[in-house]
């Protein structure tokens, strides 16, 4: 925990994308693409320390411990997706694949409407959690995401984000 707090304070001036880059798989910008960040306990702690530093506050250990306890048995991702219409986030489906098994999320947050990015691309920021049960800490997993190209849903975009859990602290 101390190492993560130091990392967050030392890198407080970096953007979220910069500080989380080593935990992120990025498929690029544009419709049907996106990025996924694995929120490990180390990264979660570092981000809380970064936030406290930016606000000129002390890092409160009880806040960090509560946050870590909350997600202790979870694999957590923050996902950024690019779509073609304002409500595309409503069609997003998540799966975590490991060892020929598919796991459904136990928690998903996706806003009902997207934000507009440059060149009118629609952007959705979401958070998804999966139970760690039956997934070892050194597993190679795939975060599989599918969403509609257009409101009718005839065509779908599919994004696959590969994570080797053993490589993330």
Please give the residue ranges for each predicted region.
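Conserved functional micro-motifs across diverse proteins
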Residues: 1-169
């Amino acid at each position: 925990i101390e190492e993560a707090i130091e990392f967050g304070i030392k890198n407080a001036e970096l953007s979220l994308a910069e500080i989380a880059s080593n935990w992120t798989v990025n498929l690029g910008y544009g419709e049907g693409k996106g990025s996924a960040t694995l929120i490990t306990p180390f990264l979660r702690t570092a981000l809380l320390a970064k936030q406290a530093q930016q606000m000129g506050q002390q890092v409160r250990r009880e806040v960090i411990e509560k946050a870590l306890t909350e997600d202790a048995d979870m694999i957590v991702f923050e996902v950024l997706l690019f779509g073609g219409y304002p409500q595309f986030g409503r069609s997003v489906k998540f799966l975590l694949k490991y060892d020929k098994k598919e796991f459904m999320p136990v928690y998903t947050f996706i806003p009902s409407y997207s934000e507009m990015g440059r060149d009118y691309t629609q952007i959705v920021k979401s958070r998804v959690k999966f139970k760690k049960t039956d997934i070892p800490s050194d597993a190679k997993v795939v975060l599989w995401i599918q969403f509609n190209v257009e409101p009718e849903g005839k065509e779908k975009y599919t994004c696959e984000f590969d994570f080797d859990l053993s490589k993330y602290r």
